[in-house]
Amino acid sequence: MKINLKKKRRPPRHFIPNILTLFNMFLGFLAIGLILNNHPIKAGVFIIIAGLFDVFDGKIARILGISSRFGMEFDSMADTVSFCVVPSILVYSLYVDGLPPLLGGFISFIPLMFGTIRLAKFNLDEEPGKPKSYTVGLTTPIATITLFSYLFFNHQIDGDFGDPRTALMLVAGLSFLMISPIHFAKFPLFSFKSGRTNTILLLAFIFSMIILAIWQGFILMPLIAVYIGWNIIHWLINPSLNDAPSEADI
């Protein structure tokens, strides 16, 4: 009688999404160091790239059919670093000078606090392998990139990082949106055969990337403002439509 001592090995592709998640976390870690060393613009570039890794890790996992609870939880840990800790450190480094230390620390803590609440809510609502066509509340990557877009915009126009009062109002607004019941459209599937809605969103994304490459810091903030504004208006006008399955899921 032969005993098979060989352990069943998982195929290498199983680790691909987790590697992308690790890159997301690593870029967030580097962004923290850049902010602390007075390089917030470079940190913002790293965070945008981290956001792309955050998009692709889940999509690749679903394409390969290897979505898992571990992957979802690991992704949340990476997002906590890149899109919760990083914006809090950015606010503390740039926008609370002159405030009492305790007050400045609390205000800086707000993105981390609301961001982690948002991530916890997402994990409760989302089932591995069964994605919805929307998210409830603004995602932490979009919220963080929005804050950095304000920094990019002002740095490109005036050479500074913007008015702290405006930045803190933006932080308050983004924090509310993260835990709000408003539905925001997810990143579209990379397919022109997944329904008309997905095709429109995919074309809009491609067009946005083209003009972003041309105008860079000038256009990122307006693009995000359009995305947030459109989703808020759409949810207010047609709240019941957001609960319907997407064409790609039917």
Spans of features found by a protein language model:
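Active-site His/Glu-centered metal-binding helix of metallohydrolases
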Residues: F26, L52, F56, I60, ...
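Helix-coil boundary and interhelical linker segments in multi-pass alpha-helical membrane proteins
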Residues: L30-F46, V85-S108, S149-A167, A213-F218
